[in-house]
Regions:
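Hydrophobic secretory-pathway targeting helix
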Residues: 1-63
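Alpha-helical transmembrane anchor segments
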Residues: 221-223, 378, 382-390
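Alpha-helical transmembrane segments and their helix-start/interface "positive-inside/aromatic belt" motifs
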Residues: 18-28, 232-245, 335-339
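Generic detector of multi-pass transmembrane helix bundles and their immediately adjacent loops
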Residues: 249, 253-383
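Hydrophobic alpha-helical transmembrane segments
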Residues: 100-113, 134, 155-164, 183-193, ...
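Short, glycine/charged-enriched hinge/interface segments at domain edges or termini
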Residues: 147-183
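Extracytoplasmic/periplasmic regions of membrane proteins
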Residues: 47-159
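Transmembrane alpha-helical segments that form the functional core of multipass membrane systems
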Residues: 166-171, 178-271, 279-292
Length: 390
């Protein structure tokens, strides 16, 4: 099976006739104007939103996190009164049944830098297992009496994630050179659009479909031209991607309506429903489907555009070009399908494991509402929220 990934639409002459070229450029210009108008109309009002309860401190403001590292870890009696307090030395050991695990954390930032605090865990499955020297993040809260308390928040991952991102960037640039660097810039642009436009607009209660379509179009215009250069070949690929995006949005809406998906089977969506009442959960689910389809659509349309233009440059009738392009496309679609399905199944392995021990039939597994709306990104977000709310 030949899975073509010749993503180089900017190279070579463009075998488009003058009329076809004018149509492509004209349509992209018109769509671009509509996207700009849509962004202006849907631009978020930056309304102040109350911080969700799990992320509030006792005064209702955002929880502050500080850096720390583990000094010692030991088995201890549960319910030690020193847990969470600011300490200047190691607390005395309490005698009794040592059913918990306590870790002394040195505070490395904030107003109590240089002091210590004590965190406690039950030691059960899923609880952190802190080793001496490990760097962590701890929350700092001040209660109404002015007393400062600390609690374990998460592992410190800044440097490890930065190192992985740096390795990824180096490999991309080393292999793809300037095109790889431009692709990385496209990723930055995509995240800026999501953070500056999409998320605030959804938070303001704007309709999910137009917001996600406008955001997706902005991302596509930026990343495709950045990564592949400005040419008629790239423009043809962009027009195909935008057309496919509309179809994907319609199919996503139809799937949600026909299968009666609500999104409320996932804890992150339930949290949004509880704390952001003006946000439509079904709309949020639909927006996730639309944004999630961008990568696949971009991959397929760019590859197909490259294949068609390469075939056209070598001559041949329109029929032979069409047949050859469809042959490449069928291989590409086939490999993309099982790639998506395997990624989908891999992200839902815990859910599949639970279904396997529950004695549920295959029909129940495939149609239960917690399964169709499952995706890697959404599962990760749900896991993150559950961990925070423990």
């Amino acid at each position: 099976m030949t899975h073509s990934h010749s993503h180089s639409p900017a190279s070579g002459p463009a075998p488009l006739g003058p009329i076809a070229a004018k149509i492509v450029v004209g349509l992209l210009a018109a769509i671009g104007v509509l996207v700009v108008i849509g962004a202006a109309l849907l631009w978020p009002a930056q309304q102040k939103v109350e911080i969700p309860l799990p992320y509030q401190n006792s005064s209702g403001s955002a929880v502050t996190t500080e850096a720390g590292h583990v000094v010692s870890t030991r088995a201890a009696v549960c319910g030690d009164q020193s847990v969470g307090k600011v300490l200047t030395s190691e607390p005395a050991r309490v005698q009794g049944d040592e059913g918990c695990v306590q870790s002394q954390i040195a505070i490395d930032s904030g107003p109590n830098q240089g002091a210590y605090t004590l965190v406690e865990f039950s030691g059960g499955p899923g609880q952190p297992n802190l080793a001496v020297g490990e760097h962590v993040r701890i929350t700092r809260q001040i209660d109404p009496t002015g007393t400062t308390t600390y609690a374990f928040y998460d592992y410190e991952r800044t440097w490890s994630l930065a190192a992985l991102a740096a390795v990824f960037a180096v490999v991309v640039v080393a292999v793809a050179r300037w095109r790889g660097l431009r692709a990385l810039l496209g990723i930055v642009v995509a995240f800026v659009v999501l953070v500056v436009f999409l998320l605030p607009a959804l938070r303001d209660g704007a309709s999910a479909v137009p917001v996600s379509l406008v955001a997706s179009a902005i991302i596509l215009y930026a990343v495709i031209y950045l990564a592949h250069g400005v040419s008629l070949r790239t423009s043809a690929a962009l027009l195909g991607t935008l057309t496919s995006l509309l179809l994907a949005a319609f199919l996503s809406w139809a799937a949600i309506e026909l299968t009666h998906l609500t999104g409320l089977s996932q804890e992150d969506n339930n949290a949004v429903a509880a704390y952001l009442g003006n946000v439509s959960i079904t709309g949020l689910l639909l927006a996730g489907f639309i944004i999630g389809s961008l990568g696949v659509l971009n991959d397929v349309t760019i590859t197909q555009a490259s294949a068609v233009f390469e075939l056209a440059e070598h001559g041949g009738s329109r029929r032979s070009i069409f047949v050859g392009a469809m042959r490449v496309g069928s291989d590409h679609i086939a490999s993309t399908v099982y790639t998506l399905v395997l990624a989908y199944a891999g992200s839902a392995l815990p859910l599949l494991l639970l279904f396997s021990v529950a004695g549920r039939g295959l029909g129940d597994v495939l149609t239960v509402r917690t399964w169709p709306s499952r995706s890697p990104a959404r599962r990760s977000a749900a896991s993150h929220w559950r961990y925070r709310c423990r």
